[in-house]
């Protein structure tokens, strides 16, 4: 008989009635790079996969109708079927293979996504089937296979069991696993499908779960809808109907499985036909090696069993014989409970003991079994228990989120470590435990005293631990001999920054670099770009970035630990970055650098949650820097102060103070050690014990310096030049320079005021010329600051004010030079007066150094910001009232000056209590206005026919009342509340904020030339001349020594490393103490609860 004829004959088979439909959700398979056309897929399936047809009719004597032992009626057999009367029916002898006629996509009731299905012979080769799954159905090679068995009949799923299944599906999704089930819409398979659906809906569609159902073709209801017609030569989509309400003994397929394999042995209504092919496929996968496997080359497979009867027992027995580990859920009933109870037996396992357990957990089933069948069950159970190392039992009542994953990982490890081939494969075992994050197992079973690990042995798993963010494993590898310095080669760092670095993080880094133009950000961006350059070559749009390269490419080879730390920090790997931080040199600098990077990136992140995480991690590193520096400072003040000024090229050449200020780490700057260091800088060689009034007195009576009124921190070496040294040390002190500048700045302001009020003539007199000279010195100082700071100069508000003041002064001089014109001379004087305000306000900045005035000035700055917000709200009310008032009172005012007064100025004055008088007709005075608009008076209000004000008082007066109420009561009190909140915030951190602001003033005067104002102008001329000579001679710059190579740096860093270890020990000790305290509290609470229970029992007994 031909293949077409057989296929047409099969179309007439009866497969049950159709019923109601049900909604579905089906996952789609994950694709790989391999792609085949539909015709290639059809040709491959038809050439390699078969169906089976009964070709010998053997009448079943037990059946009422003319039914063959294959389950089909004689009319349902293909043409040419022979009659068999004597022989016992056997599928191998009495069926024949034909090319399969049922494959393609399966659509359940026209809803949901499509799945794949295939009808195949029970003798199909596992290798061919695996090729179909991976190469033609485009499934990725699994990292794990979970074979779920048990509970094929309908049963009520307990909430705890549903939680276990949900965790099982989550594991499958996160590990890239295949799930193998029976594939039908009954019992356990139905619940597994529902959990698959829920997880697929709730998670990213790119992480679809692969759920493969393997069912018997002869047990599938409505299977005629799956058979392709003769005309379907290419793609075929079967519309499968789920008649869930029929009482047909056949099963319907589950709509939530992604792939369905329907095993055919030519029978109808015969269950468990698929068991053999399923076991063979599992064994083939478990023995197959894969280069991409995370478990030492093998694809692990685990059997997950719950409940179940005979077939579940056989499946577990077959899995154990194939060296496949099994996880059994105790409490799920039936066979699972039998096995779980027998595993706990320590004595020799006897048949009577096994039978007792069977009777206990399966009383009805065992009572119906013949004795021979019971013996078979006992034999299978004994065979399973002989390989008890392959069994792992979890209790359903104790199952939590981690119980399932721990059980699977432990089962895989036991199977792996006891396998003759793999028991000495330590690398493979370690990979398995690393994949499942089983640190305790790795510590107890692998890293023992019996084995000595070389650094090279751990490098591969170390790389995996880094990319999988396993900080505890990284620490474990470091503790067991991994040399991180040797591991971090340029190739490893390139792989980390290119393949395992988020593109979004890189974009945010680039945005931050462009937005803030910061030295550290620029350096880090170049560091990352240097590693990613090879990927840019493939991107035409980034061709312009090909020239990005570090100034010194050897930086990464000299500082690989810092590069790895930056990689972890940029990607917010919180715990991993802490482990790496502990290994770096210059931990204080690294912690502050991390705080700086994280806070800057948080500002450019669009995701609020991600930005919050970065801020939180930045604060943690600031805290670490504070605590570590405190530990260092308490041990040795001098070495701790050296840490503050230690700079490293791996952090853009910045030091701790610079990074802390750029990151606004106020808590670090406010530390006593940092403030003491700033005080030393502030006073220079002058002892801090010297009172400020003594220093100021010496400014006016200079000879007192050599009389011992001022004490110094050290004595001069040359006693003959002792007096000279005292004077030099005194006048080069930043505090003295500051005090001198304050005195002369006040004198400058007094001179400026004198010129404006008493000596401003058409021809400048001597005081005015002296004023010009002093402003020129100020101008030179601002040019120097601009030259030193570059574009960052204008980020300081005070620098902007200085520039504005100088600009106004130059503008005033320009008008002043036209003294022949009195109008121009007056304009110049007005500009000078306005400029005087700016120069006077500049005096506020000088007093930020004061502990008392400094915080008040900061409050004032913050309150100015509140005023701007208030003015915005006030402007809304003011303009609304002003325009309405002007429009009601007057018609067609053409003078802009008077429009401004009426709309803006007068409503503004009303906020301060000046009530408008032109809204009440009874008090309106026409002598204060003009009808024509030719006088310098406001336009009179519009009149009616009786020459009375036309405006309605019932509108204007309530309008004024509402406006006064809104502005004088609501808005003013809002401003007061805002001020109160701002003052409260500053007051909470009063000392910290002042200390942070003090840093800028100290650094400003420390970086200035130590020459008093105004004599510093001569030094400026000298610097300009010297710079010109350098440009002419073109002297070659000597290369600076790289950091961490100077002896003093190495000694300081080595000492900091010791302090870091002390600090970490204290942290761990404190954590252990807290844990012990919590345990003690729990014990106390438990004791109190027991006492309470006893008391309640006594009360209950007394009541009875």
Swiss-Prot record:
Grouped into one coarse class, the protein's main location is: membrane
Subunit info?
A: Homotetramer. Interacts (via N-terminus and C-terminus domains) with TCAF1; the interaction stimulates TRPM8 channel activity. Interacts (via N-terminus and C-terminus domains) with TCAF2; the interaction inhibits TRPM8 channel activity.
Q: Name one GO cellular component term.
A: external side of plasma membrane
Expression sites (tissue/organ): Expressed in dorsal root and trigeminal ganglia. Specifically expressed in a subset of pain- and temperature-sensing neurons. Not expressed in heavily myelinated neurons. Not expressed in neurons expressing TRPA1 or TRPV1.
Keyword Transferase among record annotations: no
Q: Which residue spans adopt a coiled-coil conformation according to this UniProt entry?
A: 1069-1104
- Recorded protein name is Transient receptor potential cation channel subfamily M member 8
């Amino acid at each position: 008989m031909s293949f077409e004829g057989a296929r047409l004959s099969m179309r007439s088979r009866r497969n049950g009635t159709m019923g109601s439909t049900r909604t579905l959700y089906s996952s789609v398979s994950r694709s790989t790079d391999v792609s085949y056309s539909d015709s290639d897929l059809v040709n491959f399936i038809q050439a390699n996969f078969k169906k089976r047809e009964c070709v010998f009719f053997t009448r079943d004597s037990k059946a009422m109708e003319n039914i063959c032992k294959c389950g089909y009626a004689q009319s349902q057999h293909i043409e040419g079927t022979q009659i068999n009367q004597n022989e016992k029916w056997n599928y191998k002898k009495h069926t024949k293979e034909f090319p399969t006629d049922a494959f393609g996509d399966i659509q359940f009731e026209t809803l949901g996504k499509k799945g794949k299905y295939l009808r195949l012979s029970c003798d199909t080769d596992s290798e061919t089937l695996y090729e179909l799954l991976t190469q033609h159905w485009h499934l990725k090679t699994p990292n794990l296979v979970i074979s779920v068995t048990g509970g094929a009949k309908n049963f009520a799923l307990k909430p705890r069991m549903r939680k276990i299944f949900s965790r099982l599906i989550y594991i499958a999704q996160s590990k890239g696993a295949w799930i193998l089930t029976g594939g039908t819409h009954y019992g356990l398979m139905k619940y597994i499908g529902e959990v698959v659906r829920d997880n697929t809906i709730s998670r990213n569609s790119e992480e679809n779960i692969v759920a493969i159902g393997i069912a018997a073709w002869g047990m599938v209801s409505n299977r005629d809808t799956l058979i392709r017609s003769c005309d379907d030569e290419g793609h075929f989509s079967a519309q499968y109907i789920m008649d869930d309400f029929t009482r047909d003994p056949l099963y319907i397929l589950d709509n939530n499985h992604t792939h369905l394999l329907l095993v055919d042995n030519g029978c109808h209504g015969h269950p468990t036909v698929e068991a053999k092919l399923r076991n063979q496929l599992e064994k083939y996968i478990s023995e197959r090696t894969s280069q991409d496997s995370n478990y030492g080359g093998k694809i692990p497979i685990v059997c997950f069993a719950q409940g179940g009867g005979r077939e579940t027992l056989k499946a577990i027995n077959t899995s154990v014989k194939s060296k496949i580990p099994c996880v059994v859920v105790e409490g799920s009933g039936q066979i699972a409970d039998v096995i779980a109870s027998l595993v706990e037996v320590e004595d020799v396992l006897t048949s009577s003991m096994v039978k007792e357990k069977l009777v206990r957990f399966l009383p009805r089933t065992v009572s119906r079994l013949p004795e021979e069948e019971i013996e078979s069950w006992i034999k299978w159970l004994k065979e399973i228990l002989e390989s008890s190392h392959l069994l792992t039992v979890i209790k359903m009542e104790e199952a939590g989120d981690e119980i399932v994953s721990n059980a699977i990982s432990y089962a895989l490890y036991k199977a792996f470590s006891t396998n003759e081939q793999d028991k000495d494969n330590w690398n493979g075992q370690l990979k398995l435990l690393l994949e499942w994050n089983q640190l305790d197992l790795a510590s107890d079973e692998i890293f023992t005293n019996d084995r000595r690990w070389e650094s090279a042995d751990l490098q591969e798993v170390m790389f995996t631990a880094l990319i999988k963010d396993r900080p505890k494993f990284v620490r474990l590898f470091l503790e067991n001999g991994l040399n991180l310095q040797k591991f971090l080669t340029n190739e490893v760092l390139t792989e980390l920054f290119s393949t395992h670095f988020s593109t979004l993080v890189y974009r945010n880094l680039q945005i931050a670099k462009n937005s803030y133009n910061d030295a550290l950000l620029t350096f880090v961006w170049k560091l990352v770009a240097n590693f990613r350059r090879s990927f840019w070559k493939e991107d035409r749009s980034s061709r312009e970035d090909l020239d990005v390269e570090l100034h010194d490419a050897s930086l990464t080879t000299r500082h690989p630990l810092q590069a790895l730390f930056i990689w972890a920090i940029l990607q917010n790997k919180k715990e991993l970055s802490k482990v790496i931080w502990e290994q770096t040199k210059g931990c204080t600098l690294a912690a502050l650098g991390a705080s700086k990077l994280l806070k800057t990136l948080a500002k450019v992140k669009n995701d609020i949650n991600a930005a919050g995480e970065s801020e939180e991690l930045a604060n943690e590193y600031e805290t670490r820097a504070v605590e570590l520096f405190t530990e260092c400072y308490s041990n040795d003040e001098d070495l701790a102060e050296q840490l503050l000024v230690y700079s490293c090229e791996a952090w853009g050449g910045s030091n701790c103070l610079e990074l802390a200020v750029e990151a606004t780490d106020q808590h670090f700057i406010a530390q006593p050690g940092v403030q003491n260091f700033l005080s030393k800088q502030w006073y220079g060689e002058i002892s801090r014990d010297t009172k400020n009034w003594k220093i100021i007195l010496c400014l006016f009576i200079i000879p007192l310096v050599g009389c011992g009124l001022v004490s110094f921190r050290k004595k001069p070496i040359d006693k003959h030049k002792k007096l000279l040294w005292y004077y030099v040390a005194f006048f080069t002190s930043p505090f003295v320079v500051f005090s001198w500048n304050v005195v002369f700045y006040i004198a400058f302001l007094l001179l400026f005021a004198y010129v404006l009020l008493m000596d401003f003539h058409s021809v400048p007199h001597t005081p005015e010329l002296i004023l010009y000279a002093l402003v020129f010195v100020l101008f030179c100082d601002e040019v120097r600051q601009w030259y030193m700071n570059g574009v960052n100069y204008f980020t300081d508000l005070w620098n902007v004010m200085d520039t504005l003041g100088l600009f106004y002064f130059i503008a005033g001089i320009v008008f002043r030079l036209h003294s022949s014109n009195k109008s121009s001379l007056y304009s110049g004087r007005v500009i000078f007066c306005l400029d005087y305000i700016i120069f006077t306000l500049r005096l506020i900045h000088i007093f930020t150094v004061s502990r008392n005035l400094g915080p008040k000035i900061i409050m004032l700055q913050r309150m100015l910001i509140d005023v701007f917000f208030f003015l915005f709200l006030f402007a809304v009310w003011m303009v609304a009232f002003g325009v309405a008032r002007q429009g009601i009172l007057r018609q067609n005012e053409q003078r802009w000056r008077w429009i401004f007064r009426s709309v803006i100025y007068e409503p503004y004055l009303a906020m301060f209590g000046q009530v408008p008088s032109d809204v009440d007709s009874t008090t309106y005075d026409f002598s204060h206005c003009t009808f024509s608009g030719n006088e310098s008076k406001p336009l009179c209000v519009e009149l009616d026919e009786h020459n009375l004000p036309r405006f309605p008082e019932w509108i204007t007066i309530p309008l004024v009342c509402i406006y006064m109420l809104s502005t004088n009561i609501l808005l003013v009190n809002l401003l007061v509340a805002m001020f109160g909140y701002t003052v409260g915030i500053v007051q909470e951190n009063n000392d910290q904020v002042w200390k942070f602001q003090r840093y800028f003033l100290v650094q400003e005067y420390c970086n200035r030339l130590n020459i008093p104002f105004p004599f510093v102008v001569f030094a400026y001329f000298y610097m300009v001349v010297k710079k010109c000579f350098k440009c002419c001679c073109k002297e070659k710059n000597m290369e600076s020594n790289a950091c961490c190579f100077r002896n003093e740096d190495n000694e300081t860093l080595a000492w900091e490393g010791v302090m870091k270890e002390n600090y970490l020990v204290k942290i761990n000790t404190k954590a252990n103490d807290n844990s012990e305290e919590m345990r003690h509290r729990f014990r106390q609470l438990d004791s109190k609860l027991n006492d309470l229970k006893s008391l309640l029992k006594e009360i209950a007994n007394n009541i009875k």
